[in-house]
């Protein structure tokens, strides 16, 4: 939902385009509004996620429509996620009781050093049942197995009949690395994490300097 206002500003409903959201867990065709692909976390694993995180000094979140669902609506990192994606926050008394709908992604937020231990704990508990990775030092993504931005981009590429060499991808977060490595042209923002810059083909200007527009002008329109 964070990119929906941008998609509307670009008039993608008229001109066509796709939104790959939730780290690739969902693909939406902007011209029709139809979800053409979605993979959700098996419901039987939700109890395990909740059980592993509930008693920790961390905030567990998921998404329902344009709302963030959490037991900790006042948490600073919940507020940050709300601000980044322009989503409202709904506080609930019991996360597991409330979340009976299909879940594309869960997010765990905490201070970076502490979250590293949480990441190790969850990976040890779930093994290969889920994709668990950091998008920011303070955000830990919990996704369905084999879901990341690269796998979603490949799914869309095959549907559109494109070659990898025809794809450019811009990113700044740790969860963008797979996508940047997959694309024929991988572009990191100037404000990107250093790990992202190390794997890219080109570093563009920062988000604040309209770096995506700069890259489009240089490599596509230019």
PLM features: residue spans?
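Class I S-adenosyl-L-methionine
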Residues: 4, 8-11, 54, 119-124, ...
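Active-site phosphate-binding/coordination module
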Residues: 1-77
């Amino acid at each position: 939902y964070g990119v929906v206002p941008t998609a509307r500003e670009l008039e993608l409903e008229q001109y066509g385009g796709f939104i790959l959201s939730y780290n690739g867990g969902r693909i939406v065709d902007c011209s029709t509004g139809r979800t053409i692909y979605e993979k959700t976390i098996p419901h039987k694993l939700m109890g395990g996620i909740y059980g592993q995180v509930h008693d920790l000094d961390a905030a567990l979140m998921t998404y329902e429509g344009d709302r963030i669902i959490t037991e900790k609506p006042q948490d600073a990192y919940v507020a940050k996620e709300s601000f980044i994606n322009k989503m409202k926050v709904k506080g609930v008394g019991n996360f597991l009781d409330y979340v009976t709908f299909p879940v594309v992604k869960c997010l765990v937020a905490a201070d970076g050093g502490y979250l590293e231990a949480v990441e190790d704990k969850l990976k040890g508990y779930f093994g290969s049942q889920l994709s668990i990775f950091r998008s920011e030092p303070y955000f830990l993504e919990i996704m369905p197995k084999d879901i990341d931005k690269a796998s979603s981009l490949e799914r869309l590429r095959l549907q559109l009949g494109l070659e990898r060499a025809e794809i450019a991808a811009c990113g700044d977060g740790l969860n963008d690395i797979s996508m940047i490595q997959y694309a024929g042209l991988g572009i990191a923002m100037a404000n990107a994490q250093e790990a992202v810059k190390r794997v890219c083909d080109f570093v563009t200007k920062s988000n604040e300097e309209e770096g995506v527009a700069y890259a489009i002008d240089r490599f596509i329109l230019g």
